[in-house]
């Protein structure tokens, strides 16, 4: 069985949903690094929460411990799947502000209930269809990597979709297809 995946019209793909928002990326590996750099180059301030923050610091990011980074409007989990559940429950969930949105780069943790955000916390997916190094390279070339976008749960202010659209735009995916 197949499902039709619509391409989002370009006029819906703007950076507006993230303007004035505090953005944190948890993890600075393959995808986290690319998302952080592309969002920064799109004009946003990004804080990196990482177990090993040295590389992010060297790349010019403000870094902090994960539990402090979780105090953001958009908290992007760029961690290996096997670590997401424990880090979320111990360090992120207790520190999420009311109405925040969790961002996922792949949907395993949400789909299988490893992470179940409370009501009022958004859960969105922006999943580029390529490795982080390609997401970054295409962005710097003025191109992009197509991405899948989904809203699994709305946030308190019903802005999860606008945040996801802005995130996809900020990493360059809107240039080629979301």
Where on the chain are the PLM-derived regions?
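A short helix->loop->beta-strand "cap" motif at the edges of active sites that frequently abuts
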Residues: 44, 96-100, 119-121
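NAD(P)-binding Rossmann-fold cofactor-contacting core
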Residues: 34, 40-59
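Glycine-rich adenosine-cofactor-binding loop
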Residues: 21-35
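Rossmann-fold NAD(P) dinucleotide-binding segment
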Residues: 67-112
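Glycine/serine-rich phosphate-binding loop and adjoining beta1-alpha1 elements at the start
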Residues: 1-22, 50, 151, 172-178
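Rossmann-fold dinucleotide-binding core
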Residues: 103-178
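Conserved SAM-binding strand-loop segment of SAM-dependent methyltransferases
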Residues: 60-65
């Amino acid at each position: 069985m197949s499902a039709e995946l619509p391409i989002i019209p370009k006029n819906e793909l703007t950076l507006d949903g993230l303007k004035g928002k505090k953005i944190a990326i948890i993890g600075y590996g393959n995808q986290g690094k690319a998302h952080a750099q592309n969002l920064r180059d799109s004009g946003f301030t990004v804080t990196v929460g990482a177990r090993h923050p040295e590389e992010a610091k060297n790349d010019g990011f403000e870094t902090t411990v994960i539990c402090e980074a979780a105090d953001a409007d958009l908290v992007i989990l760029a961690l290996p799947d096997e670590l997401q559940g424990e880090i979320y429950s111990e360090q992120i969930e207790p520190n999420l502000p009311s109405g925040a949105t969790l961002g996922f780069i792949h949907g395993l943790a949400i789909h299988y209930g490893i992470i179940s955000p409370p009501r009022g916390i958004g859960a969105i997916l922006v999943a580029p269809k390529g490795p982080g190094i390609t997401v970054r390279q295409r962005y710097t070339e003025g191109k992009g990597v197509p991405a899948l976008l989904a809203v699994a749960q709305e946030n308190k202010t019903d802005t999860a979709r606008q945040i996801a659209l802005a995130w996809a735009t900020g990493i360059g995916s809107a240039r080629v297809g979301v």
